[in-house]
């Protein structure tokens, strides 16, 4: 099993897909890395040689991935909260940050709705 950037890549996947298991590397960046290192994207992870793995490690080391990227993102959010910007206040309140509506929807960000058992709607007066 190839270990790159502290992540064990799945042995049976193509290396193009396997690299996307590293936080911060998507399909496009994976393809860029493979083109730069000269590794065939259709190669399975288990078929990689030691030289290929070393070349991939060096290429991935040039990007901000995994723990460093997570830390960078959390520091940016913390900075927004500390300066008291609108986005920071929305993060702190656990509400959508990018202008989505909240009267309806936004359940993921606001937490699941709890229904009270036995509570009925008031009968409508006619």
UniProtKB/Swiss-Prot annotation:
Keywords assigned by UniProt, alphabetized: Ribonucleoprotein, Ribosomal protein, RNA-binding, rRNA-binding, tRNA-binding
Sequence ranges of Basic residues compositional bias: 100-126
Region of interest (Disordered), residue spans: 91-126
RNA-binding keyword on record: yes
Pfam families named in the record: Ribosomal_S13
PROSITE patterns, alphabetized: RIBOSOMAL_S13_1, RIBOSOMAL_S13_2
GO cellular component: cytosol; small ribosomal subunit
GO molecular function: rRNA binding; structural constituent of ribosome; tRNA binding
InterPro entries, per database record: Rbsml_uS13_C (IPR027437), Ribosomal_uS13 (IPR001892), Ribosomal_uS13-like_H2TH (IPR010979), Ribosomal_uS13_bac-type (IPR019980), Ribosomal_uS13_CS (IPR018269)
Domain of life: Bacteria
GO biological process annotation, one example: translation
Function: Located at the top of the head of the 30S subunit, it contacts several helices of the 16S rRNA. In the 70S ribosome it contacts the 23S rRNA (bridge B1a) and protein L5 of the 50S subunit (bridge B1b), connecting the 2 subunits; these bridges are implicated in subunit movement. Contacts the tRNAs in the A and P-sites.
PANTHER family for the chain: 30S RIBOSOMAL PROTEIN S13/40S RIBOSOMAL PROTEIN S18, SMALL RIBOSOMAL SUBUNIT PROTEIN US13M
Assembly information from the UniProt record: Part of the 30S ribosomal subunit. Forms a loose heterodimer with protein S19. Forms two bridges to the 50S subunit in the 70S ribosome.
Family membership: Belongs to the universal ribosomal protein uS13 family.
Protein's name in the database: Small ribosomal subunit protein uS13
Source species: Acaryochloris marina (strain MBIC 11017)
């Amino acid at each position: 099993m190839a270990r790159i950037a502290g992540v064990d890549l799945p042995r049976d996947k193509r290396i193009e897909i396997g690299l996307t298991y590293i936080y911060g590397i998507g399909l496009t960046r994976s393809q860029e890395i493979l083109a730069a290192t000269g590794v065939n994207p259709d190669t399975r992870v288990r078929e990689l040689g030691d030289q290929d793995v070393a070349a991939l490690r060096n290429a991935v080391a040039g990007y901000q991935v995994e723990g460093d990227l997570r830390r960078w993102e959390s520091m940016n959010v913390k900075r927004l909260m500390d300066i008291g910007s609108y986005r920071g206040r929305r993060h702190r309140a656990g509400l959508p940050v990018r202008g989505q509506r909240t009267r309806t929807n936004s359940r993921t960000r606001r937490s699941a709705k709890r229904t009270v058992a036995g509570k009925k709607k008031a009968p409508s007066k006619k």
